From Swiss-Prot:
The keyword Nucleotide-binding applies. GO terms for biological process: NAD biosynthetic process. It catalyses: nicotinate beta-D-ribonucleotide + ATP + H(+) = deamido-NAD(+) + diphosphate. Its EC number is 2.7.7.18. CDD domains: NMNAT. Catalyzes the reversible adenylation of nicotinate mononucleotide (NaMN) to nicotinic acid adenine dinucleotide (NaAD). Keywords: ATP-binding, NAD, Nucleotide-binding, Nucleotidyltransferase, Pyridine nucleotide biosynthesis, Transferase. Pathway: Cofactor biosynthesis; NAD(+) biosynthesis; deamido-NAD(+) from nicotinate D-ribonucleotide: step 1/1. This is Probable nicotinate-nucleotide adenylyltransferase. InterPro entries: Cyt_trans-like (IPR004821), NadD/NMNAT (IPR005248), Rossmann-like_a/b/a_fold (IPR014729). NCBIfam families: cyt_tran_rel, nicotinate (nicotinamide) nucleotide adenylyltransferase. GO terms for molecular function: ATP binding; nicotinate-nucleotide adenylyltransferase activity.
Length: 193
């Protein structure tokens, strides 16, 4: 089975994340998309970052009606800080019959060369890239790599930061969130302080 790993803090997950995940599930050469919730880094200030389990719960709520999109907490069980190359090695051991690929925005591709052991990732895994609006110059060398697949996905410029700030200001951003996620956030008074 071909699995696309879509990493994120998902703080909160929003319709933009789902549009990209669903597009990859339907139009890329992938059987499933695993939305990997990244754990809180204890070295970083927590501020508005919800607890790992709360963010995972929102991903469950957002994806429960999608047969090809699954939540994943795989990085919660790995040593911190979490590096993608370690996560991929762990998944390969745990699921030897699966083929794992990464899903990332064009903005992340531009900094891939800074990732730990990025050459190992490129050698062993395909990377599906979706477009993002950016002022940074393109990494043409990486974009032409045979393991990089640029997918003509919709450009969705919604940010979790914008959503959190809007909730804090009392704005109605309900259309930007899956209904069950909005209810969960509203019921628990998340991001209001």
């Amino acid at each position: 089975m071909k699995i696309g790993l879509y990493f994120g803090t998902y703080n909160p997950i929003h319709v933009g994340h789902l549009i990209i995940a669903n597009h990859m599930a339907e139009f890329a050469d992938l059987d499933q998309i695993w939305m990997v919730v990244t754990p809180h880094n204890p070295l970083k200030k927590k501020s508005t970052l919800l607890d790992d389990q709360q963010r995972l719960q929102m991903v469950y709520l957002a994806t429960e009606d999608y047969t090809k999109i699954k939540p994943s907490d795989i990085e919660f069980k790995l040593p911190q800080p979490s590096y993608t190359v370690i996560t991929l090695e762990h998944l390969k051991e745990k699921y030897p019959n699966h083929e794992f690929s990464l899903i990332m925005g064009e903005d992340n591709l531009k900094t891939l060369h800074k990732w730990r052991n990025y050459e190992v990732i490129l050698e062993n895994h395909d990377i599906y890239v979706y477009p993002r609006i950016s002022d940074e110059p393109e990494n043409v060398e990486l974009k032409s790599h045979p393991k990089i697949h640029v997918i003509d996905a919709p450009i969705v410029e919604i940010s979790s930061t914008f959503i959190r700030n809007s909730i804090k200001e009392g704005k109605n951003i309900q259309p930007l969130l899956p209904p069950k996620v909005w209810e969960y956030i509203d019921h628990n008074n998340f991001y209001k302080k």
